[in-house]
Amino acid sequence: MARPSKKISLRKGKKRAPKGVIHVQASFNNTIVTVTDVRGQTMSWSSAGSCGFKGAKKSTPFAAQTAAENAISLLIDQGMRQAEVMISGPGPGRDTALRAIKNSGLVISFVRDVTPMPHNGCRPSSQRRV
């Protein structure tokens, strides 16, 4: 005799958060955009490499713009209205990613540069000679 099968939910329901934090990590080789809620739980992320850019194309401003648009597009449908932006790193995609976030329609409360700067800490590695 067959037992009635239990319904197993494979995925939790997506969280709805009206306010979030957008972290942009722009290195010289790639740009990673992570969207979290105010407690720090990751809701969405995207990078230039995950958007299909490979090699030297990952470090372009257009790749950073595409990564930012991909990370934010799902969350706007879920009801996110307001965001804080934290930008880290010296890469070429930081300005373009910020421009894409502004054009997405989210209300940006503030933009903060959280790039780590040493107060004369460790000695830097030697300069490359090419």
UniProtKB/Swiss-Prot annotation:
Single Gene Ontology MF annotation: structural constituent of ribosome
List the residue ranges forming a coiled coil, or say none: none
Intracellular or extracellular location(s): Plastid, Chloroplast
Which GO cellular component term is one of those annotated? chloroplast
Query: Which InterPro entries would you find in this protein's record?
Result: Ribosomal_uS11 (IPR001971), Ribosomal_uS11_bac-type (IPR019981), Ribosomal_uS11_CS (IPR018102), Ribosomal_uS11_sf (IPR036967)
Instruction: Give GO terms for biological process.
Output: translation
Q: Does the keyword Cell inner membrane apply?
A: no
Q: Which NCBIfam families match?
A: PRK05309.1, uS11_bact
According to the record's subunit comment, the protein's assembly and interactions are:
Part of the 30S ribosomal subunit.
Protein family (similarity comment): Belongs to the universal ribosomal protein uS11 family.
Q: What is this protein called?
A: Small ribosomal subunit protein uS11c
